[in-house]
Amino acid sequence: WKDKFKNVEDFRRNNVNTVVRNIQKTIIETRPEVIFSISPAADMERNYNTLFADVNTWAKEGWVDVVIPQLYFATGNDATSFNLRLDLWSQYTYENHLLIGYGIYKFGDSQYGSKFQSSDDLMKQFELASAKPKVKGSVLYSAKNLVENKVGIADAVKAIYGKKVLPPYLGRTAAVLPPTPDNIRLNGADLSWGAVSNVAYYAIYKDNGKERKADLVGITQGTSFKLSEKGVYFVTSLFKNNAESEISETVSY
């Protein structure tokens, strides 16, 4: 390694970089629709100097599609706190998408301190992350702990994610949008539209009239949907990778 690198640490980082780059290359060549994600430790310095994982380079070069830092810490003012590390990871998001990893396994376990003895801090963590425009979603570790619902963490998650939403587009390039559904029509409570070629499914929304927001009512692979309550509705089409079209014309039921 001495012929090509200044030190053994750079040599090791290059080896890891090569593995990451080759994994992505293989995915693109064989299954380009597959999303390549990596979940690094929360401590960037430890990643770089101890694990030889140069996550910042992976993100800048676009070698990984999704980064999910393991922010398994309580909120606070010290360097290891959830909020300070959230700020740091949000600053170092480039070609990749950013999802946040939550350590829900710590909640209800006395060895992890007072903030993990109720769901209040988990709610606060969600609120902090939702205020970051670059954060695309959440990953909870682990499913087992969510089912156990210690200190009400499952109830907290239900409260945060009380409304239906679609999975985000996490592709490695700018999304190519499908055509917008047209010929939107109503026959009683039956909403229907013209078929769009090569899409995976359609999403039906109800306009709530507030700040240009709408609520997801349901999804279907067909071209019709039965409405259950009065309101203003529109439809979108989605590819398999969750790239979503512009909204259709609205209809009132």
Question: Which residues make up each language-model segment?
Answer:
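Polysaccharide-binding and catalytic clefts of secreted carbohydrate-active enzymes
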Residues: 1-57, 61, 72-73
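Substrate-binding cleft of secreted/luminal carbohydrate-active enzymes
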Residues: 63-79, 89, 94-173
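Proline-enriched interdomain boundary motifs that mark the N-terminal boundary
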Residues: 175-184
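Conserved aromatic anchor
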Residues: 188-198
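Short beta-strand elements bearing conserved aromatic residues within extracellular beta-rich modules
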Residues: 202-204
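Short beta-strand segments within Ig-like beta-sandwich modules, predominantly Fibronectin type-III
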Residues: 215-222
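Beta-strand-rich modules
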Residues: 225-244
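Edge beta-strands of extracellular beta-sandwich domains
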Residues: 244-253
